[in-house]
Amino acid sequence: MKLISNDLRDGDKLPHRHVFNGMGYDGDNPAGTKSFVVTCYDPDAPTGSGWWHWVVVNLPADTRVLPQGFGSGLVAMPDGVLQTRTDFGKTGYDGAAPPKGETHRYIFTVHALDVERIDVDEGASGAMVGFNVHFHSLASASITAMFS
């Protein structure tokens, strides 16, 4: 699998437009892909368990691009696609917000799944989604961006 972003480059500083307040995917889907899950996770958050910034589930297998603003609530989601609860306590994308003076990694990951949907609702945590993804993942690809 391969993840491509017009906004992010693996290992680079996270662009300011992604700081608290799009990326695209293209190609090499594994055989049997029936849906995708996209996440943004900060493993460096001072919580002992990281911080989920974005979780979107049940993207159709023919999804190739998520337009910029897809997680903002301003872009319509296809039927059946859900954004689940982040560690900010709500759905949708919330950008980088590391403590002052710290540099954090923001890992954007797309997971190809062998099921058309995972059975979670909008209140599901990133950990719960990750648990469900674990049992249905065919492949995943990530881009890691930095911000301080």
Language-model features, listed with the residues they occupy:
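N-terminus-centered regions that define maturation/targeting leaders and the start
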Residues: M1-S148
